[in-house]
Amino acid sequence: MKLVNPHYFDVIELSDENPETLVIENPHVFKDVLQALILQSEVDVGEFVLSESETKVLSLSKYTMVLTDIFNYDTYSKQLKTKLTNIIVSNYSEIDGKEKVIGDINELGVKIMNSLPYSVSFKSAISFTDVVKFLDFSFDFSEYEFWDRFIEYISTAFELLNFKLLVTINLKDYVDHEEYVELMKFFQNKKIPLLMIERHQHEELDDISHLTIIEIGRAHV
C-alpha cells in the first residue's frame, strides 16, 4: 500500500513486513497533519490518498484505524459493539431457551399493561435482536496488562472491522526497546501494516530505511 499527502509528504510505502515512521518536527505542521488525518478517517474528506495499487484507492474512514491515544479505547468501541451484536444474532439465534425468554418478557408486558390504570400498549413483537441489545454485550479488555490490552484491542478491531492500516500517534514515547521489539513482532505476525507518526526521532528505535521526516523548518499550510 501507499499513503501520500501532497501538502506534507511524498509517497510512504506501507507493508505488513516493515513498520513505517513519519516524524513531524514542526509542532504546527504536526497539529495540522493530525487534524486532517483524523477528519478524513471520520468523514473521508481530505488530501490523504491511501492506495492498494495504481488503480485502487482505499477509503481512509473504512480501512484505516487511527489511534490518537493509546490510553483510550473509545474511538472504535461503538463499531466493535455493533459488530459483536451482529455476530451474536447471526450465530446464536437458535440457542436453547430463547423462545422462553421472549415469551416471559411478553407475558410480563401484558401483566404490567393490564394492571395500569391507563390505556397503554407495549412492543409485544420482541425479537432475539432486541434481547441481545438489552443484554448490552461489549468487549472487555480490562483484565489484560497494558500492552496485552493494546495488542488484544488492535487484533480484535482488525479481525472484525477489516482495517488495512494502523496509524499510531507518538507510540514510541511510551515504549522501551524491549517493548518496542515485541510490539513490532506482533504487528508482523498479524500482518498489520503500521505507520507511526511521531513528534521527534527516537534513535534507539528508528529504522532509517523506513523513516520519513518533515523537518522543523517546514511551514504549516
Question: What positions do the PLM features span?
Answer:
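Glycine-rich P-loop/Walker A and Walker A-like loops and their local beta1-loop-alpha1 context
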Residues: 1-86, 175
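Sensor-1/coupling segment of RecA-like P-loop NTPase cores
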Residues: 187, 191-208
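Conserved P-loop NTPase "ATPase switch" module shared by AAA+ and STAND
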Residues: 24, 159-176
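Conserved Walker B catalytic segment
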Residues: 173-191
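A mid-sequence, solvent-exposed acidic-amphipathic segment
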Residues: 135-166
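Conserved P-loop NTPase mechanochemical-coupling segment
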Residues: 105-145
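Conserved small/polar residues in nucleotide/adenosyl-binding loops
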Residues: 219-221
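Short acidic, S/G/P-rich loop/turn micro-motifs used as interaction or catalytic elements
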Residues: 27-30, 138-144, 170-176, 202-203
